[in-house]
Amino acid sequence: MIALETKNLSKKYKKKLAVNEVTISLEEHKIYGLLGRNGAGKTTLLNILAGQIISSSGSVSVFGENVFENSKAMRNICFVKVKENINLSSKVKDVFYLCNMFYENWDQEYAEELIKKFQLNAKEKYYDLSHGMQTIVGIIKGLASRAPITIFDEPTTGLDAAHRELFYELLLEDYSEYPRTIILSTHLVEEVSHVIENVIILKEGSLAVQSSVEDFLEKGHIISGHKDKVTN
């Protein structure tokens, strides 16, 4: 079943075309890696997919329904941003309370388990957290949401190696038990190569590649490099 689909999706800012005629189809219960250099249009595309901004042209559908101004479709999506729209004075536990109110599949027990595993102080105010701990709040939101479509934009920003490894371990563990469509947008390409099943590559706002990782590698491409370099 198709979980998310775009047709001829474009977003223009004045004279700059950030996303250019992107047509993709994402299946249910698969993990996708969204790759590309800085400025390739990844974050803009994700914001459109999550209904955060409106495209200039084209369409986005989630399980066959238009995503824009559609609360039912929006509840199927959890979008974890680099900078979350969180009231800085809110306590961490209150952030998760709101998540519990919004996401139909929210698992509070699992969220509390993750809080312990990441050693996060749920009584602390969000603005008092380190950058890495703020990132972890987003990670817990994404994992515990159990949303049918879960999107992570640069999910390991500010995390040390141990916490990055823990995130991917928990992601795969939870995905195996509660399958869903997951999109990981990252510049740490080699770090996600063992996690993703399918690869989507944007180049200057246009779709360059969409295929399974296996087919992509069989055709002689290389997924490697520092700072979001994708070479072939």
State where each predicted segment sits.
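Helix-to-loop junction immediately C-terminal to a conserved catalytic motif
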Residues: 50
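The feature captures the beta-strand-to-loop junction immediately N-terminal to the Walker
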Residues: 32-37
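Conserved ABC transporter NBD signature motif
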Residues: 26, 58-69, 73
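Catalytic Walker B motif of ABC-type/P-loop ATPase nucleotide-binding domains
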Residues: 150-154
